[in-house]
Amino acid sequence: MASKRALVILAKGAEEMETVIPVDVMRRAGIKVTVAGLAGKDPVQCSRDVMICPDTSLEDAKTQGPYDVVVLPGGNLGAQNLSESPMVKEILKEQESRKGLIAAICAGPTALLAHEVGFGCKVTTHPLAKDKMMNGSHYSYSESRVEKDGLILTSRGPGTSFEFALAIVEALVGKDMANQVKAPLVLKD
């Protein structure tokens, strides 16, 4: 069976943990992860001034699709940049139309709202993004740490990054693999 593939879209201002933890956990599960820089291949300054080097540009990564999951990290500025990008809109709309998984964390789900993706789904966000996300009543809201409704998977923030990542792994390659990856991480139950 061919390896599952993930696209993580990295925008300036992304939250570091919400980017790196899902990438790491998915790679541990054997998922081929591409970290694509929204603005190109140059290192990206994240929300806490950590620089992350993308594998490629989003423009180049788009030509390598489709992906089994598209992941949107949070961070206020990062989510705003994702929300304002026509290319992100195109990728999300294609992913939705082909019934591929879309995963977004923290403020990242606000990009779904901006691009009119996943309307009707139950979602969660960082508590400070809830009002923005619920503007227009396009979604129902959950206080769950991770919420999966059909092919839309959302989570709350940096502290839920491992749960978010493991939920992606479970959705793509199964609960057994998620448990195998989780065990050596020494996470609190």
Swiss-Prot record:
Keyword Hydrolase present in the record's keywords: the answer is yes
Q: Which residues carry this modification: N6-acetyllysine?
A: K148
Known post-translational modifications? Sumoylated on Lys-130 by PIAS2 or PIAS4; which is essential for cell-growth promoting activity and transforming activity. Undergoes cleavage of a C-terminal peptide and subsequent activation of protease activity in response to oxidative stress.
InterPro entries recorded: Class_I_gatase-like (IPR029062), DJ-1 (IPR006287), DJ-1/PfpI (IPR002818), Prot/Nucl_acid_deglycase (IPR050325)
Q: Which GO terms describe its biological process?
A: adult locomotory behavior; androgen receptor signaling pathway; autophagy; cellular detoxification of aldehyde; cellular detoxification of methylglyoxal; cellular response to glyoxal; cellular response to hydrogen peroxide; cellular response to oxidative stress
Residues at the active site? C106 (nucleophile), H126
Enzyme group, top EC level?
hydrolase
Compartments, record wording: Cell membrane; Cytoplasm; Membrane raft; Nucleus
Main location, first listed in the record: membrane
Question: Where does the entry say this protein is expressed, by tissue?
Answer: Expressed in erythroblasts and in mature red blood cells from peripheral blood (at protein level). In pancreas, expression is higher in islets than surrounding exocrine tissues.
Tell me what happens on changing C106A: No sulfinic acid detected following treatment with hydrogen peroxide
Outcome of C53A?
A: Sulfinic acid detected following treatment with hydrogen peroxide
Main function: Multifunctional protein with controversial molecular function which plays an important role in cell protection against oxidative stress and cell death acting as oxidative stress sensor and redox-sensitive chaperone and protease. It is involved in neuroprotective mechanisms like the stabilization of NFE2L2 and PINK1 proteins, male fertility as a positive regulator of androgen signaling pathway as well as cell growth and transformation through, for instance, the modulation of NF-kappa-B signaling pathway.
Q: What is this protein called?
A: Parkinson disease protein 7 homolog
Gene, per the UniProt record = Park7
